[in-house]
Swiss-Prot record:
It comes from the Eukaryota. Pathway: Secondary metabolite biosynthesis. The gene is imqI. It comes from Aspergillus flavus (strain ATCC 200026 / FGSC A1120 / IAM 13836 / NRRL 3357 / JCM 12722 / SRRC 167). Induction: Expression is down-regulated by ralstonins, lipopeptides produced by the plant pathogenic bacteria Ralstonia solanacearum. Expression is positively regulated by the imizoquins cluster-specific transcription regulator imqK. The lineage of its organism: Eukaryota, Fungi, Dikarya, Ascomycota, Pezizomycotina. This is Imizoquin biosynthesis cluster protein I. Residues 1-15 have a biased composition (Polar residues). Part of the gene cluster that mediates the biosynthesis of imizoquins A to D, tripeptide-derived alkaloids that serve a protective role against oxidative stress that are essential for normal germination. ImqB is a canonical three-module NRPS that assembles the tripeptide backbone of the imizoquins via condensation of Trp, Tyr, and Leu-derived precursors. N-methylation by imqF and phenol oxidation by imqC, followed by cyclization via the FAD-dependent oxidase imqH carry out the three-step transformation of L-tyrosine into tetrahydroisoquinoline. InterPro entries: MFS_trans_sf. Residues 1-43 are annotated as: Disordered. Gene3D superfamilies: MFS general substrate transporter like domains (1.20.1250.20).
Length: 105
């Protein structure tokens, strides 16, 4: 070793840097050195913002539409399945199933 030749020491497998570091946000390249990987939005502040009025308006209208649909589907099913002039099962306003559920008429 006194000849002045450069020596390279290869680390033993137990001394190498792990491929995935624990929580440091870096990764090891082939040489064993750690390279820091950053995400594109790491430096951007996160600020909570309110939703625009148009989003609230569309959501409210769609919710009302769903309530109206599911609220009318049961009476409409009665009117569609049972014809008006059927003597066995008078449907519609023939005063059977719909007036038993909703005694308003």
């Amino acid at each position: 070793m006194s000849s002045g030749e450069p020596t390279t020491m290869t680390p033993s497998p137990s001394e190498r840097t792990p491929l995935l570091s624990n929580g440091s946000g870096g990764a090891a390249d082939d040489g064993g050195t750690t390279v820091t990987i950053s995400k594109p939005n790491d430096g951007v502040r996160r600020i909570a913002d309110s939703l625009p009025l148009s989003v609230w308006l569309i959501s409210t209208i769609e919710l009302c539409e769903r309530f109206a649909y599911f609220g009318t589907i049961a009476p409409m099913q009665n009117y569609i399945q049972n014809p008006r002039n059927d003597p066995l099962r008078p449907g519609g306003i023939g005063k059977t199933a719909s007036t038993m559920i909703y005694p308003a008429v």
